[in-house]
Amino acid sequence: LGVEKDEHQAIGWYKKAAEQGHAVAQLNLGWIYANSPSRKNWEQAVYWYKQAAEQGDPRAQYNLAWCYGNGSGTPKNPRKAAYWYEEAAMQNHATAQYNLGWCYENGFGVEPDLDKALVWYHKSALQGQITAQYTLGWCYGNGRGMEVDMAKAVHWYTKAAEQGHTTAQLNLGWCHLNGKGTPVNREEALKWYLKAAEQGNATAMFNVGNCYAHGYGIEQDDKQAEEWYLKAVRHGNKKAASALRHLASKQEKEKKTDSED
């Protein structure tokens, strides 16, 4: 009841200020209408985001773009989404910059333009936006709109991985294991595979199993390999099931050899 009362009072104060043209109050009122379980009203959220966006508030511009892009509180309109993302991006809103890059890459509300997409991904990544950092790493690693440059791929994967991006951690582990863009470092590969695995990434779990099975970056340990393969199977990794069978077959052969000795 206390929270409900506080929210009711907040809406009252924000509304007074918003109606007098206060952009931050308009933004906050929009946010309440978009997020409050008891007062959710996307149409009102869009209305107030638009008021603040037209006054130049980059957060409101980003939120309004998101609403247009997702059809929340307003009919879906990719062109308006891209427009408002650009308005926010020009004011250095990092996630708006990433989303604008995505719009240009995918032709969402704008003509497809990979060069422009990469410019915006880069601006966003330099501000520390995690998805932009991963995406830029992937583009460098796969030659998407540029020459393949594995050293730059590793650079951007590392930035995203350090912020907890699971797929960046997985890909960074692969780079360290295979010496792509960085010298081979199996210990470092295992470190990043473990971080991704701890976040529930099934491929990383399988890769940790492989590290234990083959002694990559750690002492070879069939029992640990089996445990990680089982985790990977439980998370839907099909290769791990095959690896388990191979491991069981290997252990069976070793038992036979021991008994023959």
Model-predicted regions and their roles:
Residues 234-261:
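Terminal, low-structured helical/coil segments at or just beyond the last alpha-helical repeat
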Residues 3, 28-35, 63-70, 74, ...:
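Hydrophobic face of amphipathic alpha-helices that form TPR/SEL1-like repeat modules
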Residues 1, 6, 19-22, 35-36, ...:
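Short helix-capping/linker turns of helical repeat alpha-solenoids
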